[in-house]
Amino acid sequence: MTGLVLLYSGVFVAFWACLLVVGICYTIFDLGFRFDVAWFLTETSPFMWSNLGIGLAISLSVVGAAWGIYITGSSIIGGGVKAPRIKTKNLVSIIFCEAVAIYGIIMAIVISNMAEPFSATDPKAIGHRNYHAGYSMFGAGLTVGLSNLFCGVCVGIVGSGAALADAQNPSLFVKILIVEIFGSAIGLFGVIVAILQTSRVKMGD
């Protein structure tokens, strides 16, 4: 563990030292104009941003679902050794975790249907509408992906507690299940916000 901490600390220090040296050199030699965020945003294609949003929506949602299933499943299997009756009933927690991935897939399909081809290649000809659409799709994908990531972890931890509590006292299952339902609503909040972000998106010529 100490070796990993030293490795990560060394990488962290080296990264910031390199960044500091480059920044000082660019400042001394008056080359600061090369750090141009506006140039990067206008020279990249709106399709890149929309596809990044689609990829983030699916990948982060699947990571959240897998993480939640891992946390819940290990507790169900461990508690099922002592109390085999909990194995079937606590599969509800697995279903809640899997729903998180479904939210991401649905939102990725919605975003991909909004992407329309356009013929322009010059940044001025592409227009603000297409850039706005690309950035909005990226933001929507990031929103739903991160919310589903944390939703999956939340549902997994609560589901793990529900399985262990049910193994000890069956009357606690329904009470903890209510907490799990509220935890799974976090993913729905992300989907709703992502839909609002892309509600006025128009792409194409």
Curated annotation (Swiss-Prot):
Keyword NAD among record annotations: no
Membrane topology: Multi-pass membrane protein
TM segment ranges: 4-24, 52-72, 91-111, 138-158, 176-196
Cell compartment(s), UniProt: Cytoplasmic vesicle, Clathrin-coated vesicle membrane
Keyword Heme attached: no
Pfam families according to UniProt: ATP-synt_C
Tissues of expression: Expressed in brain (at protein level).
GO cellular component: clathrin-coated vesicle membrane; endosome; membrane; vacuolar proton-transporting V-type ATPase, V0 domain
Primary location recorded for the protein, binned into one broad class: membrane
Site (Essential for proton translocation) location in chain: 98
Listed Gene3D superfamilies: lithium bound rotor ring of v- atpase
Disulfides per UniProt: none
One of the GO BP terms on file: proton transmembrane transport
Keywords: Cytoplasmic vesicle, Hydrogen ion transport, Ion transport, Membrane, Transmembrane, Transmembrane helix, Transport
InterPro entries recorded: ATPase_proteolipid_c-like_dom, ATPase_proteolipid_csu, F/V-ATP_Csub_sf
Ranges in the topological domain labelled Cytoplasmic: 25-51, 112-137, 197-205
Family, per entry: Belongs to the V-ATPase proteolipid subunit family.
Function: Proton-conducting pore forming subunit of the V0 complex of vacuolar(H+)-ATPase (V-ATPase), a multisubunit enzyme composed of a peripheral complex (V1) that hydrolyzes ATP and a membrane integral complex (V0) that translocates protons. V-ATPase is responsible for acidifying and maintaining the pH of intracellular compartments and in some cell types, is targeted to the plasma membrane, where it is responsible for acidifying the extracellular environment.
Assembly, per entry: V-ATPase is a heteromultimeric enzyme made up of two complexes: the ATP-hydrolytic V1 complex and the proton translocation V0 complex. The V1 complex consists of three catalytic AB heterodimers that form a heterohexamer, three peripheral stalks each consisting of EG heterodimers, one central rotor including subunits D and F, and the regulatory subunits C and H. The proton translocation complex V0 consists of the proton transport subunit a, a ring of proteolipid subunits c9c'', rotary subunit d, subunits e and f, and the accessory subunits ATP6AP1/Ac45 and ATP6AP2/PRR. Interacts with IFITM3.
Name of the protein this chain belongs to: V-type proton ATPase 21 kDa proteolipid subunit c''
Organism: Bos taurus (Bovine)
